Amino acid sequence: EIHERLVGSEMCIRDRTRRVDSLGRIVIPKELRRMLHIKEGSPLEIYMDADETIVLKKYSQVGSLKNISQAYAQSLSKVTGAMVCVADRDEIIAAAGKNHKNYIGKALSKELENIMDKRKSALYSKKDDTLIPVVKDDKADCEAQAIAVIVHDGDSAGAVILCVYDEKADKSEIAEKLAGAAAEFLADQLG
């Protein structure tokens, strides 16, 4: 039985007491995992507050590279003229170029999450009518998209997305290669 109450604008959830099993595991209720978008195998940080409260926090491998991701996105955008986004598994953590402020901190679209789950890079274009929304409520108004998944230790850790707006230049192939280079670079930074 889960009890919910609103505190300000945040939802607080109280659950019955949980026991630690013989292997040191604690079960996180399904409703809480669903609300927080915690999937099976999602990395979590565990630490203790000053008042000896155990805190579990979603861990973003790519999020730990936020500063370097922002610098890389700016460089890539400057070179290609494309809007560049770097995403972890949940949101856009860095962006540069046209309309980039509309993307930073926004939750990823289901379509982008599916691409990341498949761990395959992809190229989409307006003329082929294959563009996908990058974030929820995105209109996908660019000419082409190159999406390269950041794979670390065999798992999808995030993605690099290039959105090309110049319809005259056929930069899609170049954009795909650059997005792949960015993904490789960021995967190497993860260790």
Regions found by a protein language model. Give the residues of each.
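Single conserved hydrophobic/aromatic residue that forms the stacking wall/gate
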Residues: E1-I13
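Short, small/polar residue-rich loop motifs at catalytic or cofactor-binding pockets
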Residues: I13-R14, K78-G81, C142-A144
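Intrinsically disordered, low-complexity terminal regulatory regions
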Residues: T17-A94
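A generic structural motif
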Residues: R33, N99, C163-V164
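Short hydrophobic/glycine-rich mini-motifs in sensory/regulatory modules
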Residues: E52, I150-V160
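Juxtadomain coupling helices with adjacent low-complexity linkers
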Residues: K66, Q70-S75, L108-E113, G158-G191
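Structured interaction and signal-relay segments at domain junctions
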Residues: A73-D137
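A short beta-strand signature within small-molecule sensing/ligand-binding domains used
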Residues: P133, K139-V151
